[in-house]
């Protein structure tokens, strides 16, 4: 779910997803093309690919449960789609801290 994804990003980076990540690099936000600009943009690319594989799921609106303990995200119980969407969303842990302000609103 997009609101849960925003919450995960804020918990991990301290940044709100909309102003900081919605228009970052080539792949963060809606759509994307070209070569990812850095590890943060690559994470967004991987996230898009992960969602793309879940063709029978409502990736942007499936509500899932997760917990955050000692810096680790654990996806909770739910339907197969809910668990898979959570797994896609938690990929952000790896690279979002490499954020560079120069790639905000990148064209």
From Swiss-Prot:
<dbReference type="Pfam" id="PF00068">
    <property type="entry name" value="Phospholip_A2_1"/>
</dbReference>
<feature type="binding site">
    <location>
        <position position="31"/>
    </location>
    <ligand>
        <name>Ca(2+)</name>
    </ligand>
</feature>
<feature type="disulfide bond">
    <location>
        <begin position="50"/>
        <end position="88"/>
    </location>
</feature>
<feature type="disulfide bond">
    <location>
        <begin position="57"/>
        <end position="81"/>
    </location>
</feature>
<dbReference type="GO" id="GO:0047498">
    <property type="term" value="F:calcium-dependent phospholipase A2 activity"/>
</dbReference>
<feature type="disulfide bond">
    <location>
        <begin position="75"/>
        <end position="86"/>
    </location>
</feature>
<dbReference type="InterPro" id="IPR016090">
    <property type="entry name" value="PLipase_A2_dom"/>
</dbReference>
<feature type="active site">
    <location>
        <position position="47"/>
    </location>
</feature>
<keyword id="KW-0442">Lipid degradation</keyword>
<comment type="similarity">
    <text>Belongs to the phospholipase A2 family. Group II subfamily. D49 sub-subfamily.</text>
</comment>
<dbReference type="GO" id="GO:0005576">
    <property type="term" value="C:extracellular region"/>
</dbReference>
<keyword id="KW-0106">Calcium</keyword>
<dbReference type="InterPro" id="IPR033113">
    <property type="entry name" value="PLipase_A2_His_AS"/>
</dbReference>
<dbReference type="InterPro" id="IPR001211">
    <property type="entry name" value="PLipase_A2"/>
</dbReference>
<dbReference type="GO" id="GO:0005509">
    <property type="term" value="F:calcium ion binding"/>
</dbReference>
<keyword id="KW-1015">Disulfide bond</keyword>
<comment type="function">
    <text>Heterodimer A-B: Sphenotoxin is a potent neurotoxin that possesses phospholipase A2 (PLA2) activity. It consists of a non-covalent association of a basic PLA2 subunit B with a non-enzymatic subunit A.</text>
</comment>
<keyword id="KW-0378">Hydrolase</keyword>
<dbReference type="GO" id="GO:0006644">
    <property type="term" value="P:phospholipid metabolic process"/>
</dbReference>
<feature type="binding site">
    <location>
        <position position="27"/>
    </location>
    <ligand>
        <name>Ca(2+)</name>
    </ligand>
</feature>
<dbReference type="InterPro" id="IPR036444">
    <property type="entry name" value="PLipase_A2_dom_sf"/>
</dbReference>
<feature type="disulfide bond">
    <location>
        <begin position="28"/>
        <end position="44"/>
    </location>
</feature>
<keyword id="KW-0479">Metal-binding</keyword>
<comment type="function">
    <text>Monomer B: Not found in vivo. In vitro, potent neurotoxin that possesses phospholipase A2 (PLA2) activity and exerts a lethal action by blocking neuromuscular transmission. Induces paralysis of the hind legs and neuromuscular blockade in mouse phrenic nerve-diaphragm preparations. PLA2 catalyzes the calcium-dependent hydrolysis of the 2-acyl groups in 3-sn-phosphoglycerides.</text>
</comment>
<dbReference type="GO" id="GO:0016042">
    <property type="term" value="P:lipid catabolic process"/>
</dbReference>
<keyword id="KW-0528">Neurotoxin</keyword>
<keyword id="KW-0800">Toxin</keyword>
<feature type="active site">
    <location>
        <position position="89"/>
    </location>
</feature>
<dbReference type="GO" id="GO:0050482">
    <property type="term" value="P:arachidonate secretion"/>
</dbReference>
<feature type="disulfide bond">
    <location>
        <begin position="43"/>
        <end position="91"/>
    </location>
</feature>
<protein>
    <recommendedName>
        <fullName>Basic phospholipase A2 sphenotoxin subunit B</fullName>
        <ecNumber>3.1.1.4</ecNumber>
    </recommendedName>
</protein>
<comment type="subunit">
    <text>Heterodimer of A and B chains; non-covalently linked. The acidic protein (B chain) has phospholipase A2 activity and the A chain weakly inhibits the B chain enzymatic activity but potentiates its lethal potency.</text>
</comment>
<keyword id="KW-0964">Secreted</keyword>
<dbReference type="GO" id="GO:0042130">
    <property type="term" value="P:negative regulation of T cell proliferation"/>
</dbReference>
<dbReference type="GO" id="GO:0090729">
    <property type="term" value="F:toxin activity"/>
</dbReference>
<feature type="binding site">
    <location>
        <position position="29"/>
    </location>
    <ligand>
        <name>Ca(2+)</name>
    </ligand>
</feature>
<keyword id="KW-0443">Lipid metabolism</keyword>
<dbReference type="GO" id="GO:0005543">
    <property type="term" value="F:phospholipid binding"/>
</dbReference>
<feature type="binding site">
    <location>
        <position position="48"/>
    </location>
    <ligand>
        <name>Ca(2+)</name>
    </ligand>
</feature>
